[in-house]
């Protein structure tokens, strides 16, 4: 990555949503899959703030830390986000979407809340933020790096 605040058009293109989806090996789950295999927030999943923001499953007789796929949906029926949990903590893939249904961000989380890789895009597909285990880059709508740092 560049350190002077600018990237070549080719470098920016490689961080665009379309390029990353096509060449980056990201798998995006369908709404049908998420609804069929996950649990929706507000129905049986809730934050337990007294326990440090663990996700709890209240669908049974007792509260248990949730392991599995959780999600929420916008009022228009489009998926808002889905993410995997292990023992009540984020662990696995998290995908967030704009109300239009377009992918907003994709994050890989490991060891229950540590981020390995994260992308966030503007709705038009331009990169907004890129994070890996070593660096973080924030971009404006013109593709210029506005913030960067080592992690």
Say what each PLM segment does.
Residues 1-151:
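Glycine/tyrosine- and acidic-biased, solvent-exposed loop/turn segments at the edges of beta-strands
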């Amino acid at each position: 990555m560049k350190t002077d605040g600018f990237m070549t058009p080719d470098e920016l293109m490689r961080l665009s949503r379309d390029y990353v989806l096509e060449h980056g090996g990201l798998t995006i789950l369908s709404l049908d899959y998420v609804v069929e295999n996950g649990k929706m927030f507000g129905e049986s999943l809730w934050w337990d703030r007294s326990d440090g923001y663990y996700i709890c499953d209240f669908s049974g007789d007792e509260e248990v830390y949730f392991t599995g796929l959780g999600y929420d949906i916008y009022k228009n029926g489009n998926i808002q986000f889905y993410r995997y949990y292990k023992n009540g903590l984020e662990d696995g893939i998290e995908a967030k979407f704009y109300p239009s249904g377009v992918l907003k961000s994709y994050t890989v989380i490991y060891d229950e809340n540590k981020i390995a890789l994260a992308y966030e895009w503007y709705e038009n597909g331009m990169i907004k933020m890129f994070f890996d285990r070593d660096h973080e880059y924030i971009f404006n709508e013109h593709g210029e790096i506005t913030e960067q740092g080592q992690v």
